[in-house]
C-alpha cells in the first residue's frame, strides 16, 4: 500500500522543495522503506526541453529519454532511484493529453472542464506506474501557493487526500521564517499567511518545514503550531546548511522522519543508519586539499544551468577527499586576444554542453589551451565537439572545420543527425521543423576501445550505458584524419557509426564525451569520469 506525501511551498519560490523532498526520501530509505519521487510543474510548456537555461536552469534527462525538471536530479542523487518519464508532469503535458482525448472523442461529448477532467488527469499523473509494493511516493508541487497556475494541482491533491484518507496521505508545507535584523527576531507572519492560503483551497498541512537561518525558539514554534493548526512537533526548523548533503542529517535531528512515521502510524523503531551521509558531509567540510577547476560555459549567469555538473564535481572531490573550487568562466571572453591566460593556474578545464554558435570559438580556445598546456580536460557533449573541431583546425590542417549547427561549412566535422537507428525503428530528423522531440535522448550504449584511457577510467568494462541529449554528432568520416594526428576515438556506438569518446594518448588526462555523465553521478557512487578527472586535477596541483 503506497502512502503519498505531498510537498508544497509558500511565501517565496526557491526555498528548496526539491532538496527537502529528496532529503525526506533519503531518510525514509535509511529506515528501510522504498520511495519514489515525482514533480508536478505548473508551467504551460510540455517539458523544459525547449526552455532557455536562463529561465529554467538545466534539463535533467532520464534513462528513458524524458527531458525533466532539475529537481529530478536531486531525487536521483539523494535516493539512487532512477527517475522515469512518468515522474515529471507539467500543465502543458496535462492539457495536451486532455485535449488529445477530447479530439478522439474519449469524453463522449461531455463539456471538458478543469474539474473534473484536468484534475483527474493530474491525479492519474500522481498515481500511475507505481509499483504495488512501493512504500512512499513523495510528490513535489512546483511553484508557490497562491499562484494561479498552481490551483488545479492543489485541487487535485486535495481530492486525493479526501479519497485516500489521512492513513495514506500527508501534506508537508515548506515556508519561510525570516529574521529581521532591525527587530532582532524571527517573523512568523509570512508562514501564517501562507498556511491560510493553503487552507483556503481545502488543504490542511500536517507538517511545516520552516526555512530559517537560525533555530526557531520553542515559543515561536508553539505560536506557529497554534496559528497554523499543526502539532508543535511537526514544526520543523529547516536551517541553512553549508552543504546540501547535510540536509538529511539536519532534518533527522529535527525529527522530520519520526513525525512522518507517526502520522502514518508506522513503527518508529531505532535510529536510521545515516553513517554514509555523515561521512560525505565530513569530507566536504574537511577535505585534504583544494583543486581549482574552470568550467568554461555560456550560461554561467544562472548557475542552475549546470546544477548536475557542479554536483558531479563535488562527488569527484568526495572520491578524492578534496574540495573542488569551481572557477566559472564565460566562454565568450576567450574570443578576445590573449584572454586564455585567464586559465593559467587552474588544475582542470571542463567545457560543458550547450547549443548555438555564441561562445563556441571561446570554447575552442579553451580546449586548445588545455591541450597545449597539458591541463586535465573534460569535454561534455558540445564540449567534445569543440575538442574535435580544435584538433581538426590546429592539428589536422583543416582550418575551415566547423559544425553545421553554426551554418553551412566546407568541412563539417560536426553535423546534424539526419537519421539514426534505435532498436529496429529508424527515425529521421531534419534541420527544419519543431525543436521539441528532435534530439537523441536517453540512455544509449558506448563500446570502449581496449587499452584506452576511457576504458581504464571505467574500470575495464567493454560497454557502458550513458545518457544523451544532442542533435549533432561528430562526423565519423573524419576519424582516420584525426587519429593520424593523435586524437583517438576511444568510444563508439556498438555499430561503430557514432563517435562517443575521444582522447589524447600523449596528454596527462584529456577526454571528450558526447553524452552527459554528470546526470548519473551520485555522492555515494561518483561517476568514474568525474572521479578520474578530479584525480588528474589533484596530480596537476601536486597534491599527491
UniProtKB/Swiss-Prot annotation:
Domain Glutamine amidotransferase type-1: 292-543
GO biological-process terms attached to the record: 'de novo' CTP biosynthetic process; pyrimidine nucleobase biosynthetic process
One term under GO cellular component: cytosol
Binding site for Mg(2+): 71, 140
A molecular function (GO) term: metal ion binding
Binding sites annotated in the UniProt record for L-glutamine: 54, 354, 382-385, 405, 471
Reaction catalyzed: UTP + L-glutamine + ATP + H2O = CTP + L-glutamate + ADP + phosphate + 2 H(+); L-glutamine + H2O = L-glutamate + NH4(+); UTP + NH4(+) + ATP = CTP + ADP + phosphate + 2 H(+)
Inhibition and activation profile: Allosterically activated by GTP, when glutamine is the substrate; GTP has no effect on the reaction when ammonia is the substrate. The allosteric effector GTP functions by stabilizing the protein conformation that binds the tetrahedral intermediate(s) formed during glutamine hydrolysis. Inhibited by the product CTP, via allosteric rather than competitive inhibition.
Residue ranges of the region described as Amidoligase domain: 1-266
Positions that bind ATP: 14-19, 71
Biochemical pathway: Pyrimidine metabolism; CTP biosynthesis via de novo pathway; CTP from UDP: step 2/2
EC numbers for this chain: 6.3.4.2
Keywords: ATP-binding, Glutamine amidotransferase, Ligase, Magnesium, Metal-binding, Nucleotide-binding, Pyrimidine biosynthesis
Gene3D superfamilies: 3.40.50.880, P-loop containing nucleotide triphosphate hydrolases (3.40.50.300)
Binding site for UTP: 13, 187-192, 223
A Pfam family assignment: GATase
Residues annotated for CTP binding in this entry: 13, 147-149, 187-192, 223
Record-annotated active site: 381 (nucleophile), 516, 518
Assembly with partners or alone: Homotetramer.
Family recorded in the similarity comment: Belongs to the CTP synthase family.
Note: CTPSs have evolved a hybrid strategy for distinguishing between UTP and CTP. The overlapping regions of the product feedback inhibitory and substrate sites recognize a common feature in both compounds, the triphosphate moiety. To differentiate isosteric substrate and product pyrimidine rings, an additional pocket far from the expected kinase/ligase catalytic site, specifically recognizes the cytosine and ribose portions of the product inhibitor.
Function, as annotated: Catalyzes the ATP-dependent amination of UTP to CTP with either L-glutamine or ammonia as the source of nitrogen. Regulates intracellular CTP levels through interactions with the four ribonucleotide triphosphates.
NCBIfam families on file: PRK05380.1 (NF003792), PyrG (TIGR00337)
Protein name, as recorded: CTP synthase
Organism: Granulibacter bethesdensis (strain ATCC BAA-1260 / CGDNIH1)
